[in-house]
Amino acid sequence: MTCLNPVFKIGDQVAEVLNIHQSLGKEAGWKRAIELLKMVGIPEPQKRVHSYPHEISGGQAQRVMIAMALACAPELLIADEPTTALDVTIQAQILDLMRDLREKTGTSILLITHDMGVIAEMADRVVVMYAGQIVEEAPVKTLFAKPMHPYTKGLLGSIPVLGRVRETLDVIPGSVPNLLNPPPGCRFEPRCQACDDIMRKRCKVENPPLIEVEPGHWVRCWLYGNN
């Protein structure tokens, strides 16, 4: 919702994208805006183009943003936390919409999210990042079945499991390092519980490279490889 300008109508904002990038006039831009709103599942798009952002729901606002992002038929759509602050039902609708649009338009989606459930549902391949670095990369099924990096294991271990009884959820101790002054070695070392005292000495001073431990499965950790 906050990405939309509160003082301009929805139609103006969608049409502006088309005017800037495709040099469409106002009339043609509004006509295309109606088509785009219809494509992303907004009811009565002919009326909604005249609405202001505060007159639509959070889910509809998210659909408007997706329409604006797809207006120029990009080859790649970068979706940064597209379901944040939406209730579970609306989240599912937005994810279904993105999946449907991907199949219809052929647009690739780079999905940025902290929600492992969304990743499991949407992704083909996953890149796990910690403190500004890639620590693991693998096909989604491989990552969930066989996580290798201690941080990835910690993320998956913190997810509640239906039917599993435990007093508290697993947590990763410590906090993220200062990115303005990162540690010289492995950035996860201060929080890592996987390395022993001997290995920790190396982890403190040497940042491990990203290595391919299995076909298509990359990890940044001294626990793996012949390093």
Residue ranges, per PLM feature:
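P-loop NTP-binding/switch modules centered on Walker-like glycine-rich loops
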Residues: 78-82, 86-168
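Short catalytic/signature loops enriched in Gly
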Residues: 43-46, 139-227
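Short coil-to-helix "N-cap" segments within the ABC nucleotide-binding domain's helical subdomain
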Residues: 8-38, 46-50, 139-150
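A short, proline-enriched helix->beta-strand linker immediately N-terminal to the Walker B motif
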Residues: 71-75
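Conserved ABC ATPase signature
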Residues: 51-56, 60
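ABC-type ATPase nucleotide-binding domain
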Residues: 3, 11, 16-21, 129, ...
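Conserved Q-loop
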Residues: 3-12, 87, 121, 185
